[in-house]
């Protein structure tokens, strides 16, 4: 009988630190990694590369079903590999973002990508980062973590990130945007942002990233009986 690969799901709102935690855990455990937030951007970029109409659901479904994408974390840096090519920077362009919002609107595309995400489940295990990983994509995952932080703390972190890149930012505007996104995510009809019933809710508001990683790894190893 083939062993089923264990999955650790990391869900939570924007800016809680999911990506950083996901990369750290994948490196510590030497497991595979899935950044579900990037999947729609990767599909949009693949469509642009292959001249597939991003407004055609029929054309997008087969592309989504066989999307050749991998995520590799090295020293805290995430590489997004599409068809053997590093597209980490390319998926962040405005053109790709616009196309991603189009492809994400199609139900059959979302269903195809759901199956594609589940295919990331390979031995020795998978760390899955998203918003509905523990509730929709991998409801049977043995370890589920819901990483949260106050909206003020998440706005503060985002402000520091943008300032480091040389952008001038308004804290109140950032905070309003985060609260608006939270409200939209938590109240949407399909796959709302809520912790799975069996998830560890980890509030990172007053914790350093090192403390978050330590707590998450300790919990995962305990649940999985890993050395």
UniProtKB/Swiss-Prot annotation:
Q: Per its UniProt entry, which superkingdom is the organism in?
A: Bacteria
Keywords of the record, alphabetical order, are: ATP-binding, Cytoplasm, Kinase, Nucleotide-binding, Transferase
Q: Which GO terms describe its molecular function?
A: ATP binding; CMP kinase activity; dCMP kinase activity
Enumerate the catalysed reactions: CMP + ATP = CDP + ADP; dCMP + ATP = dCDP + ADP
The Gene Ontology CC terms held by the record are: cytosol
Q: What is its EC number?
A: 2.7.4.25
Q: Please name the HAMAP family in this protein's record.
A: Cytidyl_kinase_type1
- Give the family from UniProt: Belongs to the cytidylate kinase family. Type 1 subfamily.
What name does the UniProt record give this protein? Cytidylate kinase
Record gene name = cmk
